[in-house]
Amino acid sequence: MKMLADTEREEALNLQIEFEWVLRQEVHAILKQLRSILVECAHRFPVPLYENEGKKTEKFILTVSPDQLKAVLTLTGDAITQADISFKLCKAPSQTQRTSITHDSPWKLQQVQDAANHLQTAINHIDDVDDSYHFKTSDEVLHVIGNILDALQRGRNSLLVPKKKPIDELIKGRNMKSLVPNLPEDLAVSFYLQSHKLIIAVYQLLNNQGTMRFDSRQAEASVQWLNDVLLLLMNGQKLCQQLKDKISVFSVYKDFTVGSRSPSALSY
């Protein structure tokens, strides 16, 4: 029985030593590695963020055949600064509707700025931890990691899950005023990001014997920087989760804190 008790004490002591090393060394090393990943992610954004080049300009062609919908556009930063849009109406398939976006009234993609803001928040949570700070409990680390994970998830969701708006809200939306010429009141255009794609959707309200419904069609194009950003955000989340899982093992031992070893054990 005494040998068993001695073995248990030795195992507990070794676990305590590893716990202290993780808190004092490994947590800071992982936070530093994580910050490097997130700053690299920030540099991929087309808006000013962590000394990147700022407003990058790219051209895209979004089309669905046979000539049902086509948009030739310029994306500058988080806004569509120029676009030529043409599409066929479902109630008059031989008729082509045309409109455009000009530099004077750009179409803002709020998802880009939202994702950038959440990324900035995640980096700020890391910067709030001084390099010389000594974590004393697992709860401290889990609190910091939880805040970072929350910000990263919000950032990814901003790009993966576009906010859906009712068609009447789209028709009356601020961005619709960017179109020249303005579209008839039964038509709406929407630009949004979903995963690594830039998507244009056109909606038309239809009155079918007194019942209102809408017809829609969409076209898309792949955006390389979106793919890079989502991959780096995912890598950051994985690193956070690995640290969280490791710390959670120690959090089972509620009496584990830095300095809780007996004086005789401090020579280990």
From Swiss-Prot:
Family label: Belongs to the rogdi family.
The identity of this protein, by name, is Protein rogdi
User: One GO BP annotation here?
Assistant: behavioral response to ethanol
Localization recorded for this chain is: Nucleus envelope; Presynapse; Cell projection, Axon; Perikaryon
Q: In which tissues is it expressed?
A: Expressed in both anterior and posterior regions of the brain including in GABAergic neurons.
InterPro entries (UniProt xref): RAVE2/Rogdi (IPR028241)
Transport as a keyword of this entry, yes or no, is no
Tell me the organism's taxonomic lineage: Eukaryota, Metazoa, Ecdysozoa, Arthropoda, Hexapoda
What's in the keyword line of the UniProt record? Cell projection, Cytoplasmic vesicle, Nucleus, Synapse
Listed GO cellular component terms?
A: axon; dendrite; nuclear envelope; perikaryon; RAVE complex; synaptic vesicle
